[in-house]
């Protein structure tokens, strides 16, 4: 927890915690499970809600090519130190190691029948053409990869309100369409 800047302000809190292995609190001191999931997405002109259950995520109808793009984007734009490990017998979710947001995205990619480990093997970080790391001002990050057909593709992840303002086209069920700032 210290590594993630989760510091106790009162000594008596530390003494009370004792030998706990994981305790996560938000700003209003509510205990959480230290696990994040994707709960809604907007893909192919459709808003999918309540997909935190992997069985629900499977119900999402997305064209195969679009799924591949989503899974590839998640795979190359998540830190390679973030991983999903098999859950223990008494746990229902995969064990998330590393950044919880990235793990939740990786879990979503997995629910879309994507194999982020395989993609990470095909695109090792050392072979990225360029990476613009996450920036709190721009609220996004981008990774450029050289694809197998020698083309270069840029993948971006970040705050939707920032990214959508920069989009000139959007991929929907019927392919690419042009959009304006307010009509994406």
Per-range role (PLM):
Residues 1-184:
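Conserved cytosolic headpiece of P-type ATPases
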